[in-house]
Every structure is written in C-alpha cells, then in structure tokens.
C-alpha cells in the first residue's frame, strides 16, 4: 500500500482547520500489531512490558542503542524518525521512515502509529539497523535516539511532527531500596500525556526499576509510598502508602495498586485529573513480613450510641513473637438500638461474609467497580486515598444480614452463616445512608484502624448490645455484681484448688488438662471472637 504525499501533507493543515477529513485510507482493515523499540529494560521488565502491551495491540522489541543516538540531528527525507511514548532512562517508541521535511515540519511513516488523531508524542531521531521480514508485516528494527520535537498528528495517512517543540508529558521518578543488599536505584522518565496509556506506561517503568534494583525474581515484602501531582495546581495531590507481600513476584505485586489508582483518577467520569509528576518510593526485602490476626477482645459489651469500645487484637508474625495492638472504636451516635456486630480484620482482607455474598451474586471485581457510586470527584478521591492499608488492623461495623455470627449468641465465640433474602445489590456495597442513587453520597461505615509493621491477614466478628443509656447502666451494674460474685467464688475455691480436690475430696480435671481451652466468661463484660477464614483483597 502506497500513501500519496498529498494525503500526508494534509496533516500540516489540520491544526489550522483548513482540512478536517482524510481520504485514501481504509478504516475497515484489521489493524496489525504495532512493533515498538524498547531500550533500558531488563529481561523481566521486557516480559512484563510485552504482557501489558497486548491490550494496546503493540509488540515491544528489545533494541540496542547506537553510538550516535544521543546527538540531535536534523531530519531529512529518507532518514529515520521515532514516535516515542517513553523517554529518559527508558525509551519506548515506533521507528519509521521520514517522507518529507519542510524546515521544522515533517511527515513520516505513510501509515498510522496509534491512529489517535491530534496527539502529543515525543519525536526522536532514530537509527535503523535492519528490516525484519515477516509474513504478517515486515518492520524496521532500530534504536530510539535523541529527542528533537513533537509528533502532533497521528492519522491514517501517517504522522506529522514539529522539530524544537516540547510535548506535554508526565514525569515519573522511582526510587527502590533493596534492604537485603543495601542497593538503591533511581529511575527518571517522561511519558506521553495519554489517560488510557499512562497507567500502563507508569507501572511498567516502575516495575523495571524494581527488577533492575533487585536483580532477581520471586518472593518479598515491599513498603511503598507514592504521590500523584496534578497538572492543575488548584487540585490536590494524591498521596498514599501501603505494604504488600508476594510469594511469587513481588515486583509485579508492588505496582498493582498504583495501576488501578492512576487508571481510576485519569479516567474518572467527573472531571479531568491530568498528571504532571509521579513520585514512587519503595523498600523491598526478601523476608516475609506478614502477621496472622489470632483473636481479639473488646470491652464493654453493652454500650450506648456515642460510647467508646476498646479493642485489643492479638497477632502472630510469621516465625515471630506474638504482639498486641489496641484500638478505640466510637459507636455512632445514630446507631440503632439492638445488636451491633463489629468486624476486626487486616486492612487488605475481604471479610468472609462479604466474600460469600460476592460469590453468591457471582460478582466480579469489574462488576463491583461499576456498582459503586460516588457523589462527585472529591468523593471518589477521598475514598481512594483513605482506602484501608494491608498493614493495618481495622475495626468496623459489619452488616448483620451478612454476618457469620448467630443472632442468638451473646458474644462472638461461634461463627455461623446467616440466611439472607436476595436483594438487588449486596449489602456490603450499600452505604449506611442513601440508596445508591446517582448524585447521592453514601456515608462510609464508621471504622477505626491502627498501623503495624506487617501485612495483616485474618478477620473475625463479635456482637455488642446497643441500649439506651439508662438500660446500659442497669445492665453494666448487673454485670458488675456478677463479677463480684465470681471473684468471691474463686476465693472460696482457692484452698481446694491448691490441693487439686473438689469439695467431695475428688481431684478436679480442668479443661486445659483435657486439651481444651476454657470457655469465655460471658459475665466479665469482655467479648471475644474466633477467627474466620478470609480472603486477602487483591
């Protein structure tokens, strides 16, 4: 297929409005995968990049650099040029032949690159090593050289560019510390300002820096923090930190969250959130820094709206010593009287009752994301930034309709799946108030959290009775009397306990001697629960 030069030269007139319609191109043809030249990527970085590029119908090839790559050269017809997506410590772009040059303007390729119309890619010199034959489509294998301008049009007849003009871009700085070796690596790149491609370009760059620093694959724990700076200085930067453990590929696991956050913010339906800078800092170790939530206790068990519940969680690190974390949870002032169920969990854990309901309705993560509603951009922004962290212990109210605790139980020592009548949406997608209608903000469920130095797994629930203040005081006085009687009984039995005999002279056999744990004392005013199996949120 030969593209007439007249069609290509029309690309220069599109900005002025003199020519809006192209001819001589066939939009019904099936697009072939676009080959890209990549330099600066590690072998595992190339594998990751190749996998992510499939969604964009692109195939990256590792390309060596030529000795003259970093020296800017004027373009000339018949020479090579690159339309580039990433530049800096990494380079990623498509190379092709320059068709015509007029001063600082040029047209090239004779076919589309991404076919995005008016665009803003980096324009680079290029050096072509050879032409790779292929039954599908032969392509030029070359290097991406020095930056010289902007590719401003990308249409069916080819690309056009302007030398000396700097395109819009997003800067990314990534710093990775390998705590095992003490090695630190930094990476600086600029990426095209394209809201659909930016999430992929960002995480493949960060992944490559992680791969380059660790120089290994496999398990590890990463502590990361990142900030997204918007182009509009009136908008708030997005800052978040988190912690991840992976037994397979910590490099890939470490960039999952950032990919989703950038995608959601850049592609949100409310208002533009164009980025100008991304800063990422990571600390990685091969050690497994995880902790299992064993159990928890809370007091008091009888409360009124506005009261404070004190929770102590017991956790066991992987091959480490058990430790405790204390939290205070305030009962909402508008909490209905009756049974209230609290969930204690790791910050990245999906409670088992919710997971069961998700499976019951056959809801995928994509469906869940579509069901969730937000009032406006600020609501979306705040929810993303305040999302629970994997290294937190979280206490929150659990919907009683999906709890695994029997309503007949006075404390949380037993787990039982509740029957539930089907509804249109699972209850865990509904806020405390509001019906999820468009434009109506759903209130977040009250919660409390505390940070740890570990990725926390496990969850469980226990119940509390919410009463009016006068009823609460009466119930607490009754509990206090029961406690006093219990203490007196223990003192009276103390002498017999020393001899190991009961009142009839027979030796007592405790539940611990039988290999059983003593039952929780329901009169103590402290509630305990057993842990349920759960699933870590991906």
Roles of regions detected by a PLM:
Residues 1-538:
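Terminal presequence/propeptide segments associated with secretion/organelle targeting
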